[in-house]
């Protein structure tokens, strides 16, 4: 180099060789105020902050090595004589101009950047500018302790092309990498005025540092970037996230002449000073940019860079795009990067430049961020919206290019198409292992092999698929531990082929129209796979290795035209495949009867196999929650049983008062863990059908075609407290019980003699004429009403056929609106009027008059008298049936008719 004279001040060797760790802070009047922060270049602005002292590196960032001698040696500056250089004060770099002097009064510029050593500089003069000399130390008096991390992109080739070298992090490095430049930001005005190679390289290096600097803010404040506070760009985040478009804050404003760059190992592109030499906006594309140069829109105003609080990595800054030195796979993908713009707005090439269509979105980052607000790092795709057919119904129509998977539920019948298993397989089959020979094809229960037939289609041959499915209570799917095995030989009549569909072996056969689209499945066996292989390969733990029951599943795709098919599927009965079960487990193939009264006692015959002399038959009932509610063992008749037949007596059901059929199950057990599959059975409620007494001439209930009793019958009650019936010639009929214990409408007949004397709560309707019909009133014919008790000699008692519950609603219509006749009962009249209001129905204590409630009026005497005499809790249906049979036992036949047999 040239002369080593310095006219500013003498050289301090302690600072040059790094012997002094920290310099005392400068006072207000120190030399740190010589450089105005407003007029200083961006690199000088960086030096005015408060750097982190050595030894106080944040967690997660490698501590830089200690300073070495020569690390802080001052860079040279141009001397007055051409071609010579002289030393600068520490931490200041002067780029000489045409009128530069040793005293710094010329037109040179002073640049002060941390960890930068200028080994050589281009002699091209700078534009004439004026700037004061830089201070000796940084604004806070701290030494320059910010070398870049090791290996930070330092793979640029050494040596200079065109006579220029560049900055290096240490004196021993001669790399030309602009990655090692450790500045913070670039000033737009300074970069616009600078036209030499050094300024262009400085612009590139400054933007590179601003995008990937690992240093946090020593002031821990996420304040916006200002020239007075350059390190606040990298303050820790307080929870908010800065816009990702802040990577453009270091871009240059206008075209600057580019300089040739040396070739790089990885085909790294050459950047110009006309724009930000970085990848495309992270809000638009995840990809890096290694293309050619192109025009770029002006950058937006500077936006803050905030450190990502959720990451501990040294390069995780929100708003900083990944650089090419960081592999693509290791970059943190934010929500803005994950959600790309429409395809038409994406960059057309990987050149790092934004397309013209996205300039507005980049210029207005707030709008783009507002659209993406509330998202996390990765954009979760919207859930797959199933069609209506998937949600319910499972439409079996598919495209030929997208057939349904094997676990897709399919019906066995669709419109006129039906896939039917004509002959079911046997309930057990000995599956063979991979290490042993074949056990043969699956047999059918009556003999032979299963038969499958397709109904509703007979146009051309179709392919029938068969696989082994599950037989548990869950949806049908391929079994993990069993698969179909192809049987071959000269005794096999059906040709088959093996195929693998989604990891499941499928046997394919042909349905021919000449065979009526039927196939005899004599070519299919069952192979047991090794448990360890399946559990390790598929992770099948929900099915379990003890699940040894399977089904034969058949599937066919019927073409429909237009590139679509209809898929139908049929599954066989469960097949037990375990070795022990084939020998010891009982199997029930048929039983009769399938229903019985709750009283039990009937004989049940089971047909099957593997029945033993000590086999047991157990009836069980489970509740809706699956818990056992009832269990009873049936008595087996050993004398009438064999290995294939069991005869037993059906036990009595636990609840005999049920009003509807009850579904229960039974199974055959040969001992512990040797049970047959459960079979369904029904218990029916008891039908009350009492036989009449021996002295009774009435074998059933009277009909409604005529009067049921003679004129001289006495129905006085022989045994209180049961009600009495009328004697003499009644013009009414006794109501009788129908199914559901309802009441039929009583028929009325005209009076032919004096009115009878009776004590009863019976109700009757008048007849409108004739002796054969029972015409009813137009609107109230279904409402029974009693005659006044005082006119017929006595007070009414309780209705003999009353029940603890009220009769059905159709038998209680509203009361008639017409007033009653003055003569309530006239022998010469053919019409019997309705009783008067306020009639004492069941006694003097009950008068449903004007003040009575509607419930009492509509209920009449059905429930009130019954509740007065017989307690509700103390009567059963059997007692009601007994009362009915006893009181109706003396009813004779109609006059002129034979008594019923």
Curated annotation (Swiss-Prot):
<keyword id="KW-0832">Ubl conjugation</keyword>
<dbReference type="GO" id="GO:0000978">
    <property type="term" value="F:RNA polymerase II cis-regulatory region sequence-specific DNA binding"/>
</dbReference>
<dbReference type="GO" id="GO:0005829">
    <property type="term" value="C:cytosol"/>
</dbReference>
<dbReference type="InterPro" id="IPR014756">
    <property type="entry name" value="Ig_E-set"/>
</dbReference>
<dbReference type="GO" id="GO:0051402">
    <property type="term" value="P:neuron apoptotic process"/>
</dbReference>
<keyword id="KW-0238">DNA-binding</keyword>
<feature type="compositionally biased region" description="Gly residues">
    <location>
        <begin position="151"/>
        <end position="165"/>
    </location>
</feature>
<dbReference type="InterPro" id="IPR013783">
    <property type="entry name" value="Ig-like_fold"/>
</dbReference>
<keyword id="KW-0963">Cytoplasm</keyword>
<feature type="cross-link" description="Glycyl lysine isopeptide (Lys-Gly) (interchain with G-Cter in SUMO2)">
    <location>
        <position position="689"/>
    </location>
</feature>
<keyword id="KW-0597">Phosphoprotein</keyword>
<feature type="region of interest" description="Disordered">
    <location>
        <begin position="791"/>
        <end position="868"/>
    </location>
</feature>
<dbReference type="GO" id="GO:0050774">
    <property type="term" value="P:negative regulation of dendrite morphogenesis"/>
</dbReference>
<feature type="compositionally biased region" description="Low complexity">
    <location>
        <begin position="114"/>
        <end position="123"/>
    </location>
</feature>
<feature type="short sequence motif" description="Nuclear localization signal">
    <location>
        <begin position="268"/>
        <end position="270"/>
    </location>
</feature>
<dbReference type="GO" id="GO:0001569">
    <property type="term" value="P:branching involved in blood vessel morphogenesis"/>
</dbReference>
<dbReference type="GO" id="GO:0003700">
    <property type="term" value="F:DNA-binding transcription factor activity"/>
</dbReference>
<feature type="compositionally biased region" description="Acidic residues">
    <location>
        <begin position="1"/>
        <end position="11"/>
    </location>
</feature>
<dbReference type="InterPro" id="IPR037059">
    <property type="entry name" value="RHD_DNA_bind_dom_sf"/>
</dbReference>
<dbReference type="GO" id="GO:1902894">
    <property type="term" value="P:negative regulation of miRNA transcription"/>
</dbReference>
<dbReference type="GO" id="GO:0043525">
    <property type="term" value="P:positive regulation of neuron apoptotic process"/>
</dbReference>
<keyword id="KW-0677">Repeat</keyword>
<dbReference type="GO" id="GO:0007616">
    <property type="term" value="P:long-term memory"/>
</dbReference>
<keyword id="KW-0010">Activator</keyword>
<dbReference type="GO" id="GO:0033173">
    <property type="term" value="P:calcineurin-NFAT signaling cascade"/>
</dbReference>
<feature type="modified residue" description="Phosphoserine">
    <location>
        <position position="334"/>
    </location>
</feature>
<feature type="compositionally biased region" description="Low complexity">
    <location>
        <begin position="272"/>
        <end position="288"/>
    </location>
</feature>
<dbReference type="GO" id="GO:2000297">
    <property type="term" value="P:negative regulation of synapse maturation"/>
</dbReference>
<comment type="function">
    <text>Ca(2+)-regulated transcription factor that is involved in several processes, including the development and function of the immune, cardiovascular, musculoskeletal, and nervous systems. Involved in T-cell activation, stimulating the transcription of cytokine genes, including that of IL2 and IL4. Along with NFATC3, involved in embryonic heart development. Following JAK/STAT signaling activation and as part of a complex with NFATC3 and STAT3, binds to the alpha-beta E4 promoter region of CRYAB and activates transcription in cardiomyocytes.</text>
</comment>
<feature type="compositionally biased region" description="Gly residues">
    <location>
        <begin position="96"/>
        <end position="109"/>
    </location>
</feature>
<dbReference type="GO" id="GO:0006366">
    <property type="term" value="P:transcription by RNA polymerase II"/>
</dbReference>
<dbReference type="GO" id="GO:0008630">
    <property type="term" value="P:intrinsic apoptotic signaling pathway in response to DNA damage"/>
</dbReference>
<feature type="compositionally biased region" description="Pro residues">
    <location>
        <begin position="61"/>
        <end position="81"/>
    </location>
</feature>
<keyword id="KW-0221">Differentiation</keyword>
<feature type="repeat" description="SP 2; approximate">
    <location>
        <begin position="277"/>
        <end position="293"/>
    </location>
</feature>
<dbReference type="Pfam" id="PF00554">
    <property type="entry name" value="RHD_DNA_bind"/>
</dbReference>
<protein>
    <recommendedName>
        <fullName>Nuclear factor of activated T-cells, cytoplasmic 4</fullName>
    </recommendedName>
</protein>
<feature type="compositionally biased region" description="Pro residues">
    <location>
        <begin position="254"/>
        <end position="263"/>
    </location>
</feature>
<dbReference type="GO" id="GO:0035886">
    <property type="term" value="P:vascular associated smooth muscle cell differentiation"/>
</dbReference>
<dbReference type="Pfam" id="PF16179">
    <property type="entry name" value="RHD_dimer"/>
</dbReference>
<keyword id="KW-1017">Isopeptide bond</keyword>
<dbReference type="GO" id="GO:0000981">
    <property type="term" value="F:DNA-binding transcription factor activity, RNA polymerase II-specific"/>
</dbReference>
């Amino acid at each position: 180099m040239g002369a080593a004279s310095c006219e500013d001040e003498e050289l301090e060797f302690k600072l040059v060789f790094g012997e002094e760790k920290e310099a005392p802070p400068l006072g207000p009047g120190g030399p740190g105020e010589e450089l105005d922060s407003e007029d200083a270049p961006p690199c000088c602005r960086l030096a005015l902050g408060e750097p982190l002292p050595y030894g106080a590196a944040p967690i997660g960032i490698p501590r830089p090595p200690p300073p070495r001698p020569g690390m802080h040696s001052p860079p040279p500056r141009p001397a007055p004589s051409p071609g010579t250089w002289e030393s600068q004060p520490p931490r200041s770099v002067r780029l000489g101009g045409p009128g530069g002097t040793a005293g710094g009064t010329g037109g040179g510029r002073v640049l002060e950047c941390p960890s930068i050593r200028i080994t050589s500089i281009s002699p091209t003069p700078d534009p004439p500018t004026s700037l004061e000399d830089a201070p000796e130390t940084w604004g806070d008096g701290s030494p320059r302790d910010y070398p870049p991390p090791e290996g930070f992109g330092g793979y640029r080739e050494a040596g200079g092309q065109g006579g220029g070298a560049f900055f290096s992090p240490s004196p021993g490095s001669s790399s030309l990498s602009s990655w090692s430049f450790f500045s913070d930001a670039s000033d737009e005005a300074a970069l616009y005025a600078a036209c030499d190679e050094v300024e262009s390289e400085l612009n590139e290096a400054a933007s590179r540092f601003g995008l990937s600097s690992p240093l946090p803010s020593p002031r821990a404040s996420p304040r916006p970037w200002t020239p007075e506070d350059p390190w606040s760009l990298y303050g820790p985040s307080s929870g908010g996230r800065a816009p990702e478009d802040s990577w453009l804050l270091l871009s240059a404003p206008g075209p600057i002449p580019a300089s040739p760059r040396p070739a790089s190992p990885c085909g790294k592109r050459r950047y110009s000073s006309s724009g930000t030499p970085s990848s495309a906006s992270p809000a638009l594309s995840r990809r890096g940019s290694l293309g050619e140069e192109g025009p770029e829109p002006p950058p937006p105003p500077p936006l803050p860079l905030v450190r990502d609080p959720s990451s501990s990595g040294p390069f995780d800054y929100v708003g900083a795009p990944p650089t090419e030195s960081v592999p693509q796979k290791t970059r943190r993908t934010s929500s803005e990067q994950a959600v790309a713009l429409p395809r038409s707005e994406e960059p057309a090439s990987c050149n790092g430049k934004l397309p013209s269509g996205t300039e507005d979105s980049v210029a207005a980052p707030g709008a783009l961020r507002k659209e993406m607000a509330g998202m996390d790092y990765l954009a979760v795709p919207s859930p797959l919206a199933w069609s209506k057919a998937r949600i319910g119904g499972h439409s079996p129509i598919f495209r030929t290019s997208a057939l349904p998977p094997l676990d897709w539920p399919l019906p066995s019948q669709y419109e006129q198409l039906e896939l039917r298993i004509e002959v079911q397989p046997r309930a057990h089959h000995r599956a063979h292992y991979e290490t042993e020979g074949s056990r043969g094809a699956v047999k059918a229960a009556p003999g032979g092999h299963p038969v499958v037939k397709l109904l509703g289609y007979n146009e051309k041959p179709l392919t029938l698929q068969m696989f082994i499915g599950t037989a548990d209570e869950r949806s049908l799917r391929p079994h993990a531990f069993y698969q179909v095995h192809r049987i071959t030989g000269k005794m096999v009549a059906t040709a088959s082929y093996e195929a693998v569909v989604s990891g499941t072996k499928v046997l394919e056969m042909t349905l021919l129209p000449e065979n009526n689209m039927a196939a005899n499945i004599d070519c299919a066996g069952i192979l047991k796979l090794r448990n360890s292989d399946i559990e390790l390969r598929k992770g099948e733990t929900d099915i379990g290795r003890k699940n040894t029951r399977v089904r034969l599943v058949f599937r066919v795709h019927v073409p429909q035209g237009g590139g679509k098919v209809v898929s139908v599927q049929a599954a066989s009965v469960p097949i037990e495949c375990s070795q022990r079960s084939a020998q010891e487990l009982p199997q029930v193939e048929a039983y009769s009867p399938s229903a019985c009264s709750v009283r039990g006692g009937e004989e049940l015959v089971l047909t099957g196999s593997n029945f033993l002399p000590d086999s047991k038959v157990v009836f069980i009932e489970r509740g809706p929650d699956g818990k056992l509610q009832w269990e009873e063992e049936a008595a087996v008749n050993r004398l009438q049983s064999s290995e294939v037949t069991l005869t037993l007596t059906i036990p009595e059901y636990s609840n005999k008062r049920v009003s509807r059929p009850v579904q229960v199950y039974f199974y055959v057990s040969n001992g512990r863990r040797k049970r047959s599959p459960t079979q369904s059975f029904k218990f029916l409620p008891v039908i009350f059908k009492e036989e009449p007494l021996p002295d009774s001439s009435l074998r059933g209930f009277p009909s409604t075609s005529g009067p049921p009793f003679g004129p001289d019958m006495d129905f006085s009650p022989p045994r209180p407290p049961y009600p009495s019936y009328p004697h003499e010639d009644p013009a009414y009929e006794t109501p009788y019980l129908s199914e559901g214990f309802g009441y039929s409408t009583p028929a009325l007949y005209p009076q032919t003699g004096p009115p009878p004397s009776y004590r009863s709560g019976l109700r009757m309707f008048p007849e409108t004429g004739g002796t054969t019909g029972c015409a009813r009133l137009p609107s109230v014919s279904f409402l029974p009403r009693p005659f006044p008790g005082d006119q017929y000699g006595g007070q009414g008692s309780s209705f003999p056929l009353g029940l603890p519950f009220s009769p059905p609603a159709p038998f209680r219509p509203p009361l008639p609106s017409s007033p009653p006749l003055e003569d309530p009962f006239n022998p010469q009249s053919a019409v019997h009027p309705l009783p008067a209001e306020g009639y004492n129905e069941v006694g003097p204590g009950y008068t449903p008059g004007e003040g009575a409630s509607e419930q009492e009026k509509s209920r009449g005497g059905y429930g009130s008298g019954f509740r007065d005499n017989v307690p509700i809790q103390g009567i059963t249906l059997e007692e009601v049936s007994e009362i009915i049979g006893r009181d109706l036992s003396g009813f004779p036949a109609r006059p002129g008719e034979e008594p019923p047999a």
